[in-house]
Amino acid sequence: MSGFNFEVITLFPKAFELINNLGVITKALDKNLIDVNLHDLREYGEGSYRQVDDKPYGGGAGMVLKPEPIFKAYESIRKLPKSKTLLMSPQGKVLKQEDFLRWSSLDQLIIICGQYEGFDERVRCLADEEVSMGDYVLSGGEIPAVSIINGLTRILPGTLGDPDSLIDESHNSYLLEYPHYTRPRVFKDMKVPDVLINGNHKEIELWRKEQMLNRTFQRRKDLIESQFSVQKHSDYDSNEWFWDI
């Protein structure tokens, strides 16, 4: 085992074949920067039919994942010293970029993917955190789990060819990223801004910061409001925060 360790408990391991076709993750796997192990819940199912779900007590629609297979799969995983267990759930805290930064200091993430109508409530005791992708419901936790593997992997040292590419990305500074342009200079009467052509790096930097602030204000004002709410309770100058982005 080498690099950052992901252990994923899932009923549909084939959903993770996607990671072998994602450039960033593939490179990290090839460099042994990460290790991804899948635990098929069906292998821990009960009886000759490998049952993993059952009808809910009290009635209701759908099927619920049984606790026994999930606990067996979880207990089969060798825990590393710095490890956290995530439960993918629409009831969880919405995933943010800062979560990737926080988890990157760990050695291991164990990710439990829900399915159907969810999982037996007793499974929650295994989790350190419950994580949601947003205020919507997917058919299972596999796609969110792939997103977590992708988002965390790309910030690990050695993954990206140019580490500086992370600096100005959307959400890394609580602002959305500035617009990007490449050749041709004019396309369908749409021109690249002159400031990006003139070679004045100070003007380019100022333009990019203005674009980040304007774009965030127009599209995600909540990010600015939350950041200034934090700064309001500290000695940090809000103008200094803007120039430090």
From Swiss-Prot:
EC number: 2.1.1.228
InterPro entries for the chain: Alpha/beta_knot_MTases, tRNA_m1G_MeTrfase_C_sf, tRNA_m1G_MeTrfase_TrmD, tRNA_m1G_MTases_N, tRNA_MeTrfase_TRMD/TRM10
Main location, first listed in the record: cytoplasm
Location(s) in or outside the cell: Cytoplasm
Entry keyword Ribosomal protein: no
Disulfide bond residue pairs: none
Gene Ontology BP annotations: tRNA N1-guanine methylation
Statement: the UniProt record of this protein carries the keyword Transferase: yes
GO terms for cellular component: cytosol
Binding site for S-adenosyl-L-methionine: G114, M133, G134, D135, Y136, V137, L138
Catalysis: reaction(s): guanosine(37) in tRNA + S-adenosyl-L-methionine = N(1)-methylguanosine(37) in tRNA + S-adenosyl-L-homocysteine + H(+)
Group of enzyme by EC: transferase
Any one GO molecular function term: tRNA (guanine(37)-N1)-methyltransferase activity
This protein's UniProt keywords: Cytoplasm, Methyltransferase, S-adenosyl-L-methionine, Transferase, tRNA processing
Subunit annotation: Homodimer.
Function as written in the Swiss-Prot or TrEMBL entry: Specifically methylates guanosine-37 in various tRNAs.
Recorded family membership: Belongs to the RNA methyltransferase TrmD family.
Name the record gives this protein: tRNA (guanine-N(1)-)-methyltransferase
Organism: Prochlorococcus marinus (strain MIT 9215)
